């Protein structure tokens, strides 16, 4: 039995939850935190986290 195979199909890739990198304010450890996850350092348990800055250039035009 020879079945034809389809090559034009598209695969559905569900969007991954956004993962952000944060720095702990107490110990300085890097933590990856996903959406709906508790904001707490995995090393020391501190709850104050700083979001990492972007690497790309951010420029604003003043008027």
Swiss-Prot record:
The keyword Zinc-finger belongs to this UniProt entry's keyword annotation: yes
Keywords: DNA-directed RNA polymerase, Metal-binding, Nucleus, Transcription, Zinc, Zinc-finger
Sites where the protein binds Zn(2+): 24, 27, 41, 44
Zinc finger (C4-type): 24-44
Alphabetical list of SUPFAM superfamilies matching this protein: RNA polymerase subunits
Pfam entry (one): Zn_ribbon_RPAB4
Keyword hit for Ribosomal protein: no
Entry GO terms, CC: cytosol; nucleolus; nucleus; RNA polymerase I complex; RNA polymerase II, core complex; RNA polymerase III complex
GO biological-process terms attached to the record: transcription by RNA polymerase I; transcription by RNA polymerase II; transcription by RNA polymerase III; transcription elongation by RNA polymerase I
UniProt GO MF annotations: DNA binding; DNA-directed RNA polymerase activity; zinc ion binding
Compartment annotation: Nucleus
Coiled coil: none
Quaternary context: Component of the RNA polymerase I (Pol I), RNA polymerase II (Pol II) and RNA polymerase III (Pol III) complexes consisting of 14, 12 and 17 subunits, respectively.
Functional note: DNA-dependent RNA polymerase catalyzes the transcription of DNA into RNA using the four ribonucleoside triphosphates as substrates. Common component of RNA polymerases I, II and III which synthesize ribosomal RNA precursors, mRNA precursors and many functional non-coding RNAs, and a small RNAs, such as 5S rRNA and tRNAs, respectively.
Family designation: Belongs to the archaeal Rpo12/eukaryotic RPC10 RNA polymerase subunit family.
Record protein name field: DNA-directed RNA polymerases I, II, and III subunit RPABC4
Organism: Schizosaccharomyces pombe (strain 972 / ATCC 24843) (Fission yeast)
